């Protein structure tokens, strides 16, 4: 069963979430659940927890997977003294304090892992990109200042090099 969640954090965190939601064209509930899934079992930071700023709250439902794993996340965090709301607040603050390219890796972990493996093995892969399936040879990840420091993929298609935004890749095989 899906759990209803309410989290309050500094306005700065909400601004970062809003920017990423718009950049990646994700629904609010989707991005919130991806963040919890990506950081729930990681070491979270208390950096920024004491920010004195206008507070904002979000309400959303945990997806089925996060609903099942949430109590384990809380236990494994080693922060048992924290309430669920404080634990979630720290997850979102940790996310907001990360570089945009790292935030992107959290949201699209599986795609990054598959492409990284293909780069290491110098192997061609298929990507679903802009409504087309393309056979590519990934070369490297790069930061693109034009897109706000999010990640771009340098790749070859038919021996011609291209640089594409990672957010445009929907699927990797």
What are the functions of these language-model segments?
Residues 1, 52, 145-147:
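Short, ordered beta-strand-loop transition motifs
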Residues 10-30, 64-86, 90:
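Surface-exposed, Lys/Arg-rich phosphate-binding patches that contact polyanionic backbones
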Residues 22, 42-75, 97-128:
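Short, positively charged interaction helices/loops
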Residues 23-49, 80-105:
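Short, basic amphipathic alpha-helical segments that act as recognition/interaction helices
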Residues 94-173:
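Core beta-strand-centered patch of the WYL/Sm-like small regulatory domain
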């Amino acid at each position: 069963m899906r759990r209803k969640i309410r989290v309050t954090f500094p306005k700065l965190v909400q601004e970062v979430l809003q920017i990423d939601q718009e950049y990646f064209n994700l629904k609010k509930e989707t991005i919130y659940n991806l963040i919890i899934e990506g950081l729930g079992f990681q070491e979270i930071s208390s950096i920024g927890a004491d920010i004195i700023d206008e507070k904002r709250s979000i309400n959303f439902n945990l997806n089925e997977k996060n609903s099942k794993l949430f109590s384990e996340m809380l236990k494994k965090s080693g922060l048992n003294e924290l309430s669920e709301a404080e634990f979630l607040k720290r997850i979102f603050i940790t996310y907001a304090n990360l570089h945009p390219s790292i935030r992107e890796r959290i949201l699209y972990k599986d795609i990054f892992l598959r492409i990284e493996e293909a780069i290491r093995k110098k192997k061609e892969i298929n990507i679903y990109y802009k409504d087309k399936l393309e056979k590519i040879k990934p070369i490297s990840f790069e930061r693109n200042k034009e897109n706000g420091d999010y990640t771009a993929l340098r790749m070859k298609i038919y021996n011609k090099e291209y640089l594409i935004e990672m957010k445009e890749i929907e699927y990797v095989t």
